[in-house]
Structure formats: C-alpha cells, structure tokens
C-alpha cells in the first residue's frame, strides 16, 4: 500500500519541514486555508544561509501553523559527519576534489529527528519541499519510514491542486499578498542554495548550464579565492586526531564537537578551501551539476588522510578507499542507516579509524593550494630508516636479500612472458606493446625461469617435487 498521499488530508494534522522561505510559508498557509492542520518543524542544522534560525518557528504561526517547533540537530549532524570523515564516505570525485556528501548527511539527520519530534506530538503525516526530480524526495521517504513505520507522506509539490494554483514563485508571492500575509521579498539568485554546518550546495537555474563556472557563486562559508582582489594570507594550522576523531586545532580543544567544526569551517573558509564543481548521477540515474562548499570537512579530511597513509599498510588503505566509496554511495541514496551501510561503517571505524592518532600541520594558501609541513604520531608504519639510502645500522634487509627477492619474481615474470608469447601467436598483441619489449619469439619464458645452476641443483629440485615438498 502506498504511503504517499496525492491530495490534501483535510482535517488532519500535517507536519511540515519549515524553512521560513517562500515555498514552505505558502504551503503552510495554503494547507490551513484548504482545511488541513499544519504543524511546522524547523531543523537547526547550523545552516550558514539562515543567520536567525531562532526566529523561524515564530514566522510559521503567522501562516496558520497550529504548533511550531525548532529541533536542534547540530550535535547529531556533527557526529554523523565525523563518522563519514573517519570512513571516507565520499564517492563523488573529480580531478582530485571530493564532494563531501554534506547534503545527504543533513537529510539523514533531519529526516529522522524531525519525524521523531512529530511523533512526540502525534503527527503522523509529513511533508517537505522536495520535488519529484531530485534526490531528497527518496532520502526523506526512507528516513521518515525508518523513524516511524506508520508515517504517511504528503508533499504539496506532488499535489496537482497545489501545483495548479501555485505553480511558481510569482504565483506564490501574489497569493500571499492577496491575503495580507507576510512575505519576505528576497533577491532572485541565479542558483539555489542549501546549507548546513558541514557544507553548502549551490545548484539549479543558471548552474544547470555547463558554460557557467564557479565564479557565478557567492560563497557563504568562505571567500572568492579565485578573485585576485581578495587578499588571502598564508596560514599554518595543526589538526590533532585521537582514534580517528579530530580533537584539537592549533593545540586548542573545544567544549563540543560542534565548536570544533565551526572553527575548522572558519579557518578553511578564509582560504576558500573545499569548494568543488561536480557532475554527478542522481539516484534516478540522471546527471546533475552542483557547486559545493565544505571548508571545515576539507581541512579535517586532508589531515586525516595524511595520517591514514602514514599508519596503515597498502591493503588497508585500499580497503578504506574502496569501501568508503561504497558507503558514500549508500549515503547519497538515503541508505546511511541501512544494515549494509552500518556494516561498512562499523568495520571502517573499528579497523581504520581507531588506529588514527596523531597531528598534522598544514600551510593553507588559496583554494586547494596547501602544503603539509609536519606529520607526527605514535604508531606509524612509516619508518624512513627502512628505506634510507644512507648507511644504517641493523638494517631490515641487505643487497643479498634483495637479490633473492628479485629471483623469486622470475616465476611470475616468466608467466607474463609466456602469455605475451601466446597472445603474439594469436595476433592479439599489437605494435605498441612490441615496440616496448621487442619481438616476442618463443622460448623467452623458459629462459627467465631457468636458474642456470648445476646439475646437482636440478637433482635436488626434482627430488623435492617428487616427494611433494612445496
């Protein structure tokens, strides 16, 4: 049975995720006029595009909300973001820059905590401003039902009656003015913005066109680092981690993780760190484009991955990247709380994050231009003396050891040569490969694998094989 209502449930209480903007203000007033009982819930997620979040619930009453609540989600959102940082749950990357999944993180938190707040008020119907073409409609649907299995969904923008009457911003503003309802006129931007404490997303409108670049965006968490008239002085910053968790910035600790993230945002923001321009696949497989800000996450991520590389071996680092990308995709799809995501998340936090303790010092300049000045920690796998070209005492291995190691490689090199000879005989190896290694005449593999030793050695080898010794 469908959980989605396609028409207004008159006479029933409907919870609306209320931002105080034009869309949700009109939705509340329209539902009240048509006979529903709107109840508004505003999430405080540290959004940088709303400087006066405390005043938002008060505005809802003017539009007919029966009750209006502000739900503080900042601490929960910061914790989920730190989990994403520890697990590397970021799958969208382009030319070395990552999108840190800041919007999907926000949806996981608001999609559950707002519905739980509604449950406290016995509100069983939920609506929000997501549209049918985007990702959020599915994310909110999944998280809402996880938090309240009896939840029903009503979205004004899926109601043909609402869309027919109030199909655009012009119609919405005129509708409010005709009823003498307050309307905060705002300058029409060339793009839309959605933000929380971890980052900001800019998309749609002019940004849908790929002949428009990042310069169109006015950053809300940082500076226009591409503008030469913006002065940005170099700055050194040290980030301390304990068991995969950032605990200090420049040696200072903080009363809460929220305060630490705010400080990281301030430092990264004044250098324009963490802005990226991405083309991505939405959940419905259509491609979209977004320009993202995440100055604090980018700063913490740079320091964290430096420590990951210093502490863990190659296979562990590879698993961290591979499983982190899978986890990032699950989060993007609204599956951050699904069992398959929890399995990946717990494993990465336990076996990768828990070992990450240390301090990294970076010198920030403009945008992504930074240097790592120092990396310190108590349990590194990095030991420069192991590979030093200088003479060292008690070396881990010597020249003779390396000769033996290279000799053991003859087996797989011979296998590769044999396959190349086979492919050459089948006409599969082209001129580009031949130009590198020459003509592939038969017999090369045997020459590589041959030891060239005495007949006595051959007798020993034969005896070992016949006796089954491996």
UniProtKB/Swiss-Prot annotation:
Binding annotation for ATP: 17-25, 43, 129, 131, 136, 194
Region (Disordered): 448-470
EC number(s) from the headed UniProt entry: 6.3.4.5
Enzyme superclass (EC): ligase
InterPro entries to which the protein is assigned, alphabetical: Arg_succ_synth_type2_subfam, Arginosuc_syn_C, Arginosuc_syn_N, Arginosuc_synth, Arginosuc_synth_CS, Arginosuc_synth_type_1_subfam, AS_cat/multimer_dom_body, AS_multimer_C_tail
Record carries keyword Glycosyltransferase: no
List of residues binding L-aspartate: 131, 135-136
Sites where the protein binds L-citrulline: 99, 135, 139, 192, 201, 203, 280
Highest taxon of source: Bacteria
Catalytic activity reported: L-citrulline + L-aspartate + ATP = 2-(N(omega)-L-arginino)succinate + AMP + diphosphate + H(+)
A molecular-function term among this protein's GO annotations: protein homodimerization activity
Keyword set, alphabetical order: Amino-acid biosynthesis, Arginine biosynthesis, ATP-binding, Cytoplasm, Ligase, Nucleotide-binding
Gene Ontology cellular component list: cytoplasm
GO biological process: argininosuccinate metabolic process; L-arginine biosynthetic process; urea cycle
Record flagged with keyword Cytoplasm: yes
Subcellular location: Cytoplasm
Pathway participation: Amino-acid biosynthesis; L-arginine biosynthesis; L-arginine from L-ornithine and carbamoyl phosphate: step 2/3
Subunit field text: Homotetramer.
Family that this chain belongs to: Belongs to the argininosuccinate synthase family. Type 2 subfamily.
Protein name: Argininosuccinate synthase
Species name: Kineococcus radiotolerans (strain ATCC BAA-149 / DSM 14245 / SRS30216)
Taxonomic placement: Bacteria, Bacillati, Actinomycetota, Actinomycetes, Kineosporiales
Gene field: argG
């Amino acid at each position: 049975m469908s959980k989605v209502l396609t028409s207004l449930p008159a006479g029933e209480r409907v919870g609306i995720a209320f931002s105080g903007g034009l869309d949700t203000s009109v939705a509340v007033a329209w539902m009240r006029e048509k006979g529903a009982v709107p109840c508004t819930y505003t999430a405080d997620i540290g959004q940088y595009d709303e400087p006066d979040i405390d005043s938002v619930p008060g505005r809802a009453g003017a539009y007919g909300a029966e009750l209006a609540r502000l739900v503080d989600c900042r601490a929960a959102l910061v914790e989920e973001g730190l989990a994403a940082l520890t697990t590397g749950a970021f799958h969208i990357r382009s030319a070395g820059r990552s999108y840190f999944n800041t919007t999907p993180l926000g949806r996981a938190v608001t999609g559950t905590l707002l519905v739980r707040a509604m449950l406290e008020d016995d509100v069983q119907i939920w609506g929000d401003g997501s549209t049918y073409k985007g990702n959020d409609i599915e994310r909110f649907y999944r998280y809402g039902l996880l938090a309240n299995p009896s939840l029903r969904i009503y979205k004004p923008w899926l109601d043909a009656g609402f869309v027919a009457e109030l199909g655009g911003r012009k119609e919405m503003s005129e509708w409010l003015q005709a009823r003498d309802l307050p309307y905060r006129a705002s300058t029409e931007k060339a793009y839309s913005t959605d933000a929380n404490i971890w980052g900001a997303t800019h998309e749609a409108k002019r940004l849908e066109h790929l002949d428009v670049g990042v310069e169109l965006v006015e950053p809300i968490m940082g500076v226009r680092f591409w503008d030469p008239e913006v002065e940005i002085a170099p700055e050194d910053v040290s980030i301390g981690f304990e068991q995969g968790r950032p605990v200090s910035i420049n040696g200072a600790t903080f009363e809460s993780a929220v305060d630490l993230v705010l400080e990281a945002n301030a430092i990264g923001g004044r250098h324009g760190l963490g802005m990226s321009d991405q083309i991505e696949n939405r959940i419905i497989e259509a491609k979209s484009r977004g320009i993202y800000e995440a100055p604090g996450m980018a700063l913490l991520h740079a320091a964290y991955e430096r420590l990951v590389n210093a502490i863990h071996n190659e296979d562990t680092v590879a698993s961290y990247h591979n499983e982190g990308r899978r986890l990032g995709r699950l989060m993007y799809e609204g599956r951050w709380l699904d069992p398959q995501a929890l399995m990946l998340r717990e494993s990465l936090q336990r076996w990768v994050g828990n070992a990450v303790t240390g301090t990294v010092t970076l010198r920030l300049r403009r945008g992504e231009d930074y240097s790592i000045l120092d990396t310190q920690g108590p349990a590194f796998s990095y030991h420069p003396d192991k590979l030093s070209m200088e003479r060292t005492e008690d070396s881990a291995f010597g020249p003779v050891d390396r000769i033996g190691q290279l000799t053991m490689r003859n087996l797989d090199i011979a296998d590769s040569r044999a396959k190349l000879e086979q492919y050459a005989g089948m006409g599969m190896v082209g001129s580009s490969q031949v130009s590198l290694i020459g003509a592939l005449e038969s017999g090369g593999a045997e020459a590589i694998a041959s030891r060239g030793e005495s007949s006595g050695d051959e007798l020993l080898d034969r005896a070992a094989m016949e006796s089954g010794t491996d």
